[in-house]
């Protein structure tokens, strides 16, 4: 890539001869980038998308031995991937993201899910879920609002369904409801959640914000998508990563 006079940035601790090194991915938030490459697991990929403002395509390389649900390749495949990128023999996989807001403050976007749970573990909270003109009220430990990308994550571990990544829907999954309440699949429109106790608002298991009791937490589709570089089309990509 450097031989082709491509300008390359690396984020510490990665170091490549001829590349400009920055200390944190946030230093590239507004940079005009054509491509990003992440080395690590899904957490690294989620963090990268959260910090970059523009819809920059990302090639996710799984390093570390975990499943890498979001990744496209492993390190031994990197030369093949670069060749396909240079020859434009790739396709872009666009995924919806979600963002939460409370009291006129927008929180960082999430690719997988937003998890709202009770702060006080000694009391069961009453959660009110509003969508369009309907309301569901239930005592439970929390609520997950997941995207199709996140349908193989926390929501799935609680019995939620797996969805194809290209769908524009949200999955609302209750966490330990007192009375059994199934996951609810809704169009990607505004969802409002209110709890009668103070709550945590957790984005992709990485960023935690808080809300007071009776605050309205609004979750909606984020204005910008996450864009993945794919070397080949795969109809059930996420399910195959889970071993199905």
Give the ranges of each region predicted by the language model:
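Catalytic phosphate-donor-binding core of small-molecule kinases
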Residues: 2-27, 64-143, 152-244
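Short Gly/Thr/Asp-enriched flexible loops that form oxyanion-binding sites at enzyme active sites
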Residues: 46-54, 155-159
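Proline-centered loop/turn at the N-terminus of a beta-strand
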Residues: 57-59
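Generic structural signal for beta-strand residues in well-ordered domains
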Residues: 1, 29-30, 51
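Short glycine-rich anion-binding loops that position phosphate/pyrophosphate groups of nucleotides
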Residues: 41-44, 64, 149-152
